[in-house]
């Protein structure tokens, strides 16, 4: 008979932190004392799993990065049409934010305002990777389909990332009322008409 698997305390801590970021507490600085109370452990117990609060945030950032880029790779493997790839990548990013409001606070930098600069730098690197991915998809169009975009691919990629970041910021600013994927089909029709 298999014994029930004991929940991983490290994952519990990260889950609790993400939930706190999603709640009204996420609008303020989250202390380790509040987090320990939420998890139901002492602060010392938190530090047995993570040497610092920054490491807890790093754990969530690693989850964000792994979740997004593993799916990006799947999109690139499964889909070859440039515009479809862009559409799916945009939808992926917006849906990820919608499903993970607490993590979206991290991605906008809102939750990292009073934290270590290194954390904000990690988020910046994620967005730079996303922009690079858009740029690569756009540049490959010339090779795959034999036609270029009327505007430089770097400018288009920056515009696409700006749209995503704007949607994330609006979502956080509205206390998660304005869903990033709301009206996506109309949003995509407008955007795709501009970049063709």
Curated annotation (Swiss-Prot):
Pfam family, one: TetR_N
Main location per the UniProt record: cytoplasm
Localization per Swiss-Prot or TrEMBL: Cytoplasm, Nucleoid
Gene Ontology process terms (BP): cell division; negative regulation of division septum assembly
Subunit description: Homodimer. Interacts with FtsZ.
Family: Belongs to the nucleoid occlusion factor SlmA family.
Protein name, UniProt field: Nucleoid occlusion factor SlmA
Organism: Aliivibrio fischeri (strain ATCC 700601 / ES114)
Gene: slmA
């Amino acid at each position: 008979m298999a014994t029930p698997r004991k929940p991983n305390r490290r994952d519990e801590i990260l889950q609790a932190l993400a939930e706190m970021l999603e709640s009204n507490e996420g609008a303020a600085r989250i202390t380790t004392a509040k987090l320990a109370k939420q998890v139901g452990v002492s602060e010392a117990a938190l530090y047995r799993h993570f040497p610092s609060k920054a490491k807890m945030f790093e754990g969530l950032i690693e989850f964000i990065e792994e979740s997004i880029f593993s799916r990006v790779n799947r999109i690139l493997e499964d889909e070859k049409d440039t515009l479809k790839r862009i559409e799916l990548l945009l939808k992926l990013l917006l849906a990820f934010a919608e499903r993970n409001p607490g993590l979206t606070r991290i991605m906008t930098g809102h939750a990292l305002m009073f934290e270590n600069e290194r954390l904000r730098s990690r988020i910046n690197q994620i967005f730079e990777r996303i922009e690079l991915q858009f740029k690569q998809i756009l540049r490959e169009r010339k090779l795959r389909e034999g036609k270029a975009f009327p505007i430089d691919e770097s400018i288009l990629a920056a515009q696409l990332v700006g749209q995503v970041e704007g949607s994330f910021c609006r979502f956080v600013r509205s206390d998660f009322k304005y869903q990033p994927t709301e009206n996506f089909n109309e949003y995509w029709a407008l955007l795709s008409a501009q970049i063709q």
